C-alpha cells in the first residue's frame, strides 16, 4: 500500500493528538447533541485534545456535540467513537493550558 505524504502527515498529526497527556477525572458534565435534549455524562479521563466519558444516552460517531465543562463552559467537540455507554470525543480546538488547569480540582 502506498501512502501519499499528505495522508501520512494527517495520520502523524492524529497520533500526536491522541498521545496528549490524559488525566483521570471524576467530572459530571452535560452534553448537547444537535436535535436532542441535553443529557448527563461522566468524563473519566480528559486531555487538552479530548475526553472519554460514560453516558446512558446514545451518541453517534462523528456527531458534533457541546460539552459543558465546569469552570470553563460549553466546548465544541466531535464524537470519534462509542462503545456501549462509553464515548470518546475530540475537542474542536486545543484546550488552552490555563483552561485545562481549571479542571485540576477534579483530577483523581
Functional labels for PLM-detected ranges:
Residues 1-108:
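Structured alpha-helical
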Amino acid at each position: 500500500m502506498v501512502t501519499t505524504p499528505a495522508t501520512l502527515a494527517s495520520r502523524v498529526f492524529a497520533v500526536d493528538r491522541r498521545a496528549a497527556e490524559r488525566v483521570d477525572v471524576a467530572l459530571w458534565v452535560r452534553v448537547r447533541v444537535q436535535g436532542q435534549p441535553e443529557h448527563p455524562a461522566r468524563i473519566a479521563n480528559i486531555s487538552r485534545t479530548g475526553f472519554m466519558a460514560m453516558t446512558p444516552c446514545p451518541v453517534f460517531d462523528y456527531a458534533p456535540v457541546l460539552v459543558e465543562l465546569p469552570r470553563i463552559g460549553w466546548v465544541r467537540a466531535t464524537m470519534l467513537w462509542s462503545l456501549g455507554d462509553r464515548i470518546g470525543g475530540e475537542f474542536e480546538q486545543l484546550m488552552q493550558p490555563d483552561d485545562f488547569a481549571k479542571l485540576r480540582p477534579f483530577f483523581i
